[in-house]
Amino acid sequence: MVRKTDVKVVEGLRGGNGTVELHHIVSKEELNGHGTMYAHVIIKPHSSIGLHQHVGNTEPYYIIKGRGVFVDNDGSRIDVGPGDCCIIEVGQSHAMENNTDEDLEMIALVYNE
């Protein structure tokens, strides 16, 4: 099977600011109960994904383009760029900010514990 990705544009994702595009690579159903999201995520300039907690799942972000600030579970703010992998473990909270004039692109996978 070959198909196009399902694209969703969200304003204020998880209480964040601005626009985030979610290009779902496979659907939740196609993950067969192993997870809820596998997507190419584009955080538009001066936008963010708000602070939220992962209950019952883990999420790695792999940055492929642009620069951003990862807000970790302990509140620390870490500059990230292409090639960086941010791992959010079960029970942890996090946020991601794009404070630049360019898109921040990453691959995100949310899988169940």
Regions found by a protein language model. Give the residues of each.
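A short, N-terminal "cap"/entry segment at the start of jelly-roll beta-barrel domains
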Residues: 1-36, 50
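Glycine- and acidic-residue-biased ligand/ion/polar-headgroup-sensing regions
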Residues: 56-68
